[in-house]
């Protein structure tokens, strides 16, 4: 995941900061407890594609 891209993209739901989870290949929004998938290295920032996170998954 390109760190420059992480600096400019935001959660499509709340416009909050997204964090990259390398082990799960997801972008995490800690404010909404959502995980957005990466497909072929491309972030899929659609709310309908996001999965809800359990409380312990969204902690830093």
Curated annotation (Swiss-Prot):
GO terms for cellular component: cytosol. It comes from Enterobacter sp. (strain 638). InterPro entries: Trm112-like. This is UPF0434 protein Ent638_1436. PANTHER family: PROTEIN PREY, MITOCHONDRIAL, ZGC:162634. Pfam families: Trm112p. Belongs to the UPF0434 family.
């Amino acid at each position: 995941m390109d760190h420059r891209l992480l600096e400019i993209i935001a959660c499509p739901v709340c416009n909050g900061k997204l964090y990259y989870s390398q082990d799960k290949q997801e972008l995490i929004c800690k404010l909404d407890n959502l995980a957005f998938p990466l497909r072929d290295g491309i972030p899929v920032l659609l709310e309908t594609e996001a999965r809800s996170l359990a409380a312990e998954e969204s902690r830093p």
